[in-house]
A protein has these predicted regions:
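Assembly/oligomerization interface modules of large self-assembling protein complexes
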Residues: 19-110
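Alpha-helical scaffold segments that mediate packing/assembly in large oligomeric complexes
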Residues: 110-191, 314-316
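Short, solvent-exposed amphipathic alpha-helical segments in soluble enzyme
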Residues: 129, 217-221, 308-310
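Extended, compositionally biased alpha-helical segments that mediate assembly or anchoring
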Residues: 265-316
Length: 316
């Protein structure tokens, strides 16, 4: 059965459809929970496919209750291990102290109104089209919220007036050479090793990606754009907005502020979400209409800012 078939059955008060509505609303926490209704899995997969930035971060499930949630962070870590000088000597002492932070849980959703005539007498594809539009709008809204949070956090870390978290580039973006980039990546790898985080990918704004693609050696482009072969230092999929640079995955961050470049460990930012975003509200018997809504709950927070290593280019 399709989503349109489900909506028609739900409008008739079909017991199985009503039960499925409650299961969708309360129990589904991921896209793979063994649910036997194929269209539900398809809905969640379509939502994930349209969230390019959200998908590079860590995901977790929201708690059952609460308008805000707390999460633990490491405040200080003085632990260390050294060689014991001689038998019986005290080992090196250290301790970890923890703190808590809180983040608000926000609601994202929208609805559409359809007449009972459309629900009961139209062909299923017409209903599916309306539902698909809501799914896509939900994906766009939640993806935009995650992008805004990530981009703001990167800029805040890089441009902080006190103890900024950044790597200083040796040149302006326009003047960065392949050697400059290679050194920058090595510096980032060394810093990531010190912080015990992963150098998973380099996230960049559109202008930075264009600058990377424009790198040349005696007129020959460094990047393979055709996909027909491997070039010297990397390749880039112009439609998938992702590629590799010196074996490091590169992801374009759509609509990020100009000059944005940041090495990103997925565990640096966590996205908490509720279950499958589907719910049918009550109809209006005086107008013979039904309101179909899509909604979900989401929270976003920086759970390990050490996993973000922003790049600061020299001013032009």
């Amino acid at each position: 059965r399709t989503a349109g078939d489900y909506l028609q059955a739900l409008s008739r008060g079909d017991e199985a459809a009503v039960q499925l509505m409650h299961e969708c609303r309360d129990l589904i926490a991921t896209g793979d929970t063994g649910n036997t209704s194929a269209w539900i899995a398809d809905d969640l997969r379509l939502i994930e496919m349209r969230r390019k930035v959200t998908n590079i971060l860590t995901h977790d499930t929201l708690p059952d209750k609460g308008m805000t949630m707390e999460y633990n962070v490491v405040s200080t870590d003085t632990t260390g291990v050294t060689k014991q000088a001689k038998e019986g000597d005290a080992l090196k002492f250290g301790k970890v102290t923890f703190g808590t932070k809180s983040v608000s849980i926000d609601t994202y959703g929208g609805y559409t109104t359809m007449s009972r005539q459309v629900i009961e007498r139209s062909t299923t594809p017409m209903l599916n089209t309306a539902l698909a539009a809501l799914r896509n709008a939900y994906a766009k809204a939640t993806e935009t919220a995650v992008r805004d949070y990530l981009y703001t956090t990167i800029a805040g870390q890089r441009d902080a007036t006190s103890n900024p978290n950044k790597l200083d580039a040796p040149a302006t973006l326009a003047n960065m050479t392949i050697d400059n980039w290679a050194t920058l990546i090595m510096d980032a790898a060394e810093l990531a090793d010190d912080r015990n985080v992963n150098l998973t990918r380099l996230g960049v704004s559109k202008d930075v990606m264009a600058s990377l693609i424009d790198l040349k050696d005696s007129g020959s482009r460094f990047f393979d754009l055709s996909g027909d072969g491997s070039d010297t230092i990397g390749d880039f999929d112009l439609t998938g907005i992702a590629g590799k640079f010196l074996r490091l995955p590169v992801q374009m961050l759509p609509k990020a502020p100009a000059g944005t470049a940041c090495f990103i460990d997925p565990e640096s930012v966590t996205v908490w979400e509720s279950g499958g975003p589907t719910q049918l509200s009550d109809g209006d018997p005086t107008k013979l209409t039904e309101n179909y809504s899509v909604y979900g709950y989401m929270a976003v927070a920086a759970t390990n800012v050490d996993g973000l290593i922003p790049v600061k280019f020299k001013a032009a």
